[in-house]
Amino acid sequence: MTETKGATVRVAVEDGIAMVTVDNPPVNAISQAIRQGLIDAMAEINGNPEVAAAIIIGAGRYFMAGADVREFDKPALPPSLPEAISSIESSEKPVVAAIHGVALGGGLEVALGCHYRIVDPGAKLGLPEVALGIIPGSGGTQRLPRLIGFAKALDLISSGRQAGAGEAAEMGLVDAVAEGELAAAAMDFIRQRIGAAPPRLSAIDPPAPESQDFFETARARLARRARGQESIVRALDALEAATLPFDQGAKREREIFNELRGSDQAKALRHAFFVKPREVASIGVVGGGTMGAGIAVASLRAGYQVTMVEASSDALTRGLGNVEKNL
């Protein structure tokens, strides 16, 4: 075995198979270092004649839980995630994503850029970007419908929900569910595909929508459901761009992503994602009747300082009495 040490991405070669391990605790967020590490790893793999295929896997509990959201409010640092994914997809040697834990957002987009996908039975996959006021911006809206069709792709992207391993296999999102240890299963899987031309989703002709009025009907339905949330409706705009040649559709997707990233809605949702609730030290209770006294008693028992407010001193005295009776 040979191994190249890196800060966040490691490459180990054994019996002609390169194991590319993404290691960025706690959730393997796809930071600038991860993006650069993936590009460097693919260059090393394709330049090594002893390597016939590669596996991309995550260290710890997850494959990759998405982009590093903390970077969204800062100037973009190269390389971009689309560039990193392109370096994987363009590999002349087959690459399989070995997914455990979760592959979410950019993590699933990385997996879609791999030629194959194998998952642990407990894995979850999804594109939850709409919950942050954005859309998948690294080819997810372009590759996913080419793999599973527009209807299923729209369901996953517009809802942001996660699909389990069984559902992912049934819809064609993954190629196999691992039996036994994931890394070993991925090794067996990719060995059987050495020498075959790696399938690339970006090379597939644009798919036809399920019906002639698919986008029109979906847009009306999503507008009602979105209730003003821009990202849900704009996700459909990006998906519709998948009817174009891949490069054109990917360019449109990135334009929409960048427009949404700087929007007030996205900024507010990112704030809500990171904000921590303020610590509560004291509680005010208005009214000392049965309900107010009950709230006061529960709060006191939980260790909070309680201030009771009533309309008169007599009512306050009765309220305090109600509290004392229940303590």
Regions found by a protein language model. Name each.
Residues 1-59, 83-86:
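Conserved CoA-thioester-binding segment of acyl-CoA-metabolizing enzymes
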Residues 39, 69-101, 140-142, 147, ...:
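An acidic, glycine-rich surface segment that forms the CoA-thioester-binding/catalytic face
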Residues 87-132, 136, 164, 287-290, ...:
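Glycine-rich beta-to-alpha active-site loop
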Residues 115-137, 174-187, 309-313:
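Gly/Pro- and small hydrophobic-enriched strand-loop and loop-to-helix capping segments
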Residues 275-326:
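NAD(P)+-binding Rossmann beta1-loop-alpha1 motif at the extreme N-terminus of oxidoreductases
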